[in-house]
Structure formats: structure tokens, C-alpha cells
Amino acid sequence: MKSSLRFLGQELVVEGVIPADNAFNEAVYDEFIKIFGTDKKFGIFPSENFSKPEQTESIFQGVVTGKFESEAPVKIEVYIEDSLVASVAAFISFRK
């Protein structure tokens, strides 16, 4: 199984975990620090699902918990202190 996050033209893949696992979160955080810098805070939030907008939250939860083998659109928000400085479109995915 593998979990991945695609954003800014690159893909971060972590083998053997679901997106909700600490190992995936730590890898994502380390990648964000490399790209955005150490003085930032980050948040990942579900974006509206393109084909089934009414199921956005359940699809996101299913992918993150490894129940759905799929991908979900998300947005990455980047903050300095409490100010939003960037919002980046991305996809989080899970494959068995």
C-alpha cells in the first residue's frame, strides 16, 4: 500500500502507510518545510470533489483512513503566524 500527496508539480509517496498515519504526516511536514520554510504553519483541508460534491467529506475521510482506494482534492494552506500567505491545490491519495 502507499499514500501520496501531489502538489506543485511533484509527488510525495510514502509506502506501507495510510494518509492518517504519523509516518505520512511527518514526511509531508518535512516536505513542506523544505519548500515553504521553517517559519510557516500548515493546514490541509478537503476541497470540493469534482464528480460528487455532495460526498466531499466522506470521500476525503475514506481516502485519509485507507478505506477508499482513491484520491481526494485538498488545499494546502500556508500561514506565517496567523496570516494566510498561500493556498495551494493538491491531491491526497491512497492505493493498496
Swiss-Prot record:
Name of the coding gene: y12A
Recorded superkingdom: Viruses
Organism: Enterobacteria phage T4
Entry-linked InterPro entries: DUF5498
Protein name as annotated: Uncharacterized 10.7 kDa protein in Gp54-alt intergenic region
Entries under Pfam families matching the protein: DUF5498
